Amino acid sequence: MGGRYDRNTFDEQDEVNPFANPGSVPAASNSRLSPLPPEPAGFGYGRTVDIPLDRPGSGAQDLKKKEKELQAKEADLRRREQDLKRKQDAAARAGIVIEAKNWPTFFPLIHHDIANEILVRLQRLQYIAFATYLGLVLALFWNIIAVTTAWIKGEGVTIWLLAVIYFISGVPGGYVLWYRPLYRAFRSDSAFNFGWFFLFYMLHILFCLFAAVAPPIVFKGKSLAGILPAIDVLSAQALVGIFYFIGFGLFCLESVVSIWVIQQVYMYFRGSGKADDMRRDAARGAMRAAI
């Protein structure tokens, strides 16, 4: 049994004085931790980092290159504008009007600019004439609807085919044969265009009057939504009769407005002296033909 002052095995054998000289401190003989190997004190500054740097002056060169490209494009656009202006001026001197398609705006099909190309005192009349063209389109389209109902009720497919033919021939025909000549006549005061308009607008009015009545000449008249077929089918098929009566009203309205338009155009034509010009042109043409 050990004594009171037996040596404690957990005590360090060498006592260290903390106030002793640091240079004379003995190394711990019983240290259980091995010191870490020394690390180089480079702090990462020794590694080379590749940073892509542009060459001096390359940014300025790119800017100059882009500036030259923009100047070249600008010069090309200016040259094209000048060429287009020269062509337009030459066409204007020759009496040729370049008609760019601008109507309808969502899908341009025709050139139409009453506000900028027609005289102010004639714009109202031109707008009403344009309304008669749109009225013809509406009447022919409704005619297809009315005849389609009659076909469904057992009237036969032939009248429907005729109604479609009226539409696909009347819509472009009305524009080419009488509306565009009137537009050009008001724009350039051309006696020839006035004469062309009067001829085919009269045929347009006669067709509308014929369609409003729809006499039983072709397939009992049921290919046109007029008053006579409306009365004929109303007792047996009320819906078809109502549709035909609506078509009759559209053709009547189209006829009345068209008669007013041709009267107003003729009054302007006589008052402007174009009638005399037309007679002189006709006499001159007859003289050339005789010679």
Swiss-Prot record:
Record's subcellular location: Cell membrane; Cytoplasmic vesicle, Secretory vesicle membrane
Signal peptide segment: none
Modified residues (Phosphoserine): 34
GO cellular component, one term: transport vesicle membrane
One Pfam family per UniProt: SCAMP
Residues spanning the membrane: 127-147, 159-179, 194-214, 242-262
Record's compositionally biased regions (Basic and acidic residues): 1-10
Cytoplasmic compartment spans: 1-126, 263-288
One GO-annotated biological process of the protein: protein transport
Family: Belongs to the SCAMP family.
UniProt-recorded name of the protein: Secretory carrier-associated membrane protein 5
